[in-house]
C-alpha cells in the first residue's frame, strides 16, 4: 500500500473519531471499525499479491477466501451508501469534507481490492 493511502486512512479515521453526530455516534463508531477492518483486509490481499505465489497459502489459511472477498465487497458497498447518506444530510462543512474524502477513499480501495483479487485468481 502506498504511503498516501495509509495517511488517507489514518486522516479520515482521525477526523471521523472527532465528529460528534449526536444519537448516531454508535453508527459512526461502527463505520470507523469497518473502515479499519477494510484497511487490514486490503493490506493482507496486497501482501499476498506481492508474494504472488502465495495463492495456495491464502487458500489454505482461509478456504473460503472468495466468500470473504464477496463479503468485503458488500461491506464496501454498504459503507459507500452510508457515507453518501451522511454526506446528503450533514450541513457541517468539516463533516462534508471528511465524508467526501472517505467516499473517494472507499472507491479507490474497492478498485485496489478488485485488482488484487483478479491477480490472485
Swiss-Prot record:
The keyword Nucleotide-binding does not apply. SUPFAM superfamilies: Nonstructural protein ns2, Nep, M1-binding domain. Disulfide bonds: none annotated. Its main location: virion. Keywords: Host nucleus, Host-virus interaction, Transport, Virion. It is found in: Virion; Host nucleus. One of its GO terms (biological process) is exit of virus from host cell nucleus through nuclear pore. GO terms for cellular component: host cell nucleus; virion component. Pfam families: Flu_NS2 (PF00601). A motif (Nuclear export signal) lies at residues 12-21, 85-94. Mediates the nuclear export of encapsidated genomic RNAs (ribonucleoproteins, RNPs). Acts as an adapter between viral RNPs complexes and the nuclear export machinery of the cell. Possesses no intrinsic RNA-binding activity, but includes a C-terminal M1-binding domain. This domain is believed to allow recognition of RNPs bound to the protein M1. Interacts with protein M1. May interact with host nucleoporin RAB/HRB and exportin XPO1/CRM1. Belongs to the influenza viruses NEP family. This is Nuclear export protein. It comes from Influenza A virus (strain A/Grey teal/Australia/2/1979 H4N4).
Amino acid at each position: 500500500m502506498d504511503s498516501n493511502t495509509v495517511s488517507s486512512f489514518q486522516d479520515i479515521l482521525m477526523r471521523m473519531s472527532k465528529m460528534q453526530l449526536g444519537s448516531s455516534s454508535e453508527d459512526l463508531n461502527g463505520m470507523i471499525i469497518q473502515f479499519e477492518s477494510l484497511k487490514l483486509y486490503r493490506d493482507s490481499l496486497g501482501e499476498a499479491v506481492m508474494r504472488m505465489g502465495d495463492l495456495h497459502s491464502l487458500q489454505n489459511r482461509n478456504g473460503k477466501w472468495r466468500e470473504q472477498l464477496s463479503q468485503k465487497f458488500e461491506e464496501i458497498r454498504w459503507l459507500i451508501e452510508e457515507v453518501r447518506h451522511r454526506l446528503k444530510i450533514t450541513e457541517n462543512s468539516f463533516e462534508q469534507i471528511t465524508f467526501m474524502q472517505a467516499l473517494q477513499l472507499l472507491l479507490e480501495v474497492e478498485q485496489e481490492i478488485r485488482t488484487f483479487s483478479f491477480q490472485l485468481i
